[in-house]
Amino acid sequence: YYNFDMSGIWIVEGTPDLRPEKSHNFTFSAEYAKPRYNATASVYYNHVQDKIATAAPYYKKPGDKLPYLPYVNLADFKVYGGELGLNTRWNNGFSARFTYAYTKEELPTDNDGNSINNQYIPARAHALNVWAEYEHRWSKLYRTNFCLSGRLLSATENREYVDYYDISKGTVKVKYPAYTVWKLATTHQFGQAVKLSLALDNLFNYRPRYYYLNAPLTDGINFQVGLSIDIDKF
């Protein structure tokens, strides 16, 4: 069965007696549509029994150099939430989309109320995504498109080891702050053959305080330029 040395931190070890997961998922959704508007709403509840995950690391023998991280079945795991969405499109070239999502996870906890399974950063409870676009054809030979998109995510907390190479130092609660990332992009089409693309990614130059797991992998604002030419359309 599985036995893997994870970069000298610990040995991830499989368990032959694992039970299969059982999941019960319930979803309710509704949609309302008109010629220029579309709205959606949904709620869900997912209950997983015997969820397979990693337990707390431990030393098998006093002389072991690396701790073992075994796979186990969690007694109970629940996640629930909902999403609201709105899409609009007007005849003047403007269109927009907004979505809001709420997510709540419930993991088993120890006697101190700490999550016993923190192999990943917990989901951020609130997430808002925004997308807006304007498109206009100025003539038969020139068309432009402008698009602004962004996401806003709430803060979250996770309990992590102070030193992954020395788990005897214990754990500490780490807060991952809320953040927002935006992108502004524009395309300019000349005739049928030439298209110029320009973009500013991470528009407000956001940099995470620390990079870990699902933190955004960005080191600041990024400028992008692209040019495509379809030779067969000249």
What residue spans do the PLM features occupy?
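Short strand-coil-strand connectors
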Residues: A33-P35, N91, S139, G191
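Generic structural detector for well-ordered beta-strands
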Residues: D17-R19, N73, D230
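Surface-exposed loop/turn and secondary-structure junction residues enriched for glycine/proline
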Residues: Y1-S7, E21, H47, K51, ...
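Surface-exposed loop and edge beta-strand positions of immunoglobulin-like domains
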Residues: R19-E21, E31, S42-Y44, A75-F77, ...
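Surface-exposed extracellular loop regions of Gram-negative outer-membrane beta-barrel proteins
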Residues: Y1-N25, Y45-L69, S154-D163, N205-T218
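Gram-negative outer-membrane beta-barrel transporters
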Residues: Y44-V48, Y59, K65-Y161
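Membrane-embedded beta-strand positions in outer-membrane beta-barrel channels/transporters
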Residues: T15, N25-E31, N38-T40, Y71, ...
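Conserved C-terminal beta-signal and adjacent last beta-strands/turns
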Residues: E21-F28, A101, Q119-F234
